Amino acid sequence: MSETSWNEQFRNRTKKLAIAIIKAFSSWKKTDEIRIIGKQLIRSSTSVAANYRAVCRARSDRERYAKLCVVVEEADETQFWLEILVESDLIKIEEILNIRQEVEEIVKVMTTYKYRLEKNSTQ
């Protein structure tokens, strides 16, 4: 697979994640806690998608690395908010199992990509 098609595939994947989170949030009971945490979750997940797009359009390796750091940070924050929702018994894990798995995979892939980019820039 070429780098361009991989980037396109991952852009779509991060966007689908953000959309899945928005749809999940819209189906949850709107308590104050869910509203507050849900909005944070939407912000972090849409930031993953938006910043990955920026990674693909970076003008230099430095810029690509900086944006990739943001993607990893925001994806990790997305994981955090999902954990908070489940561990505080606001939603059941079954409601977001697929989303949690997808976020975990994105964190792993982006962290690996970040380390490879960092390693290549120091050689």
Regions flagged by a language model, labelled:
Residues 1-123:
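Amphipathic alpha-helical assembly/interaction segments
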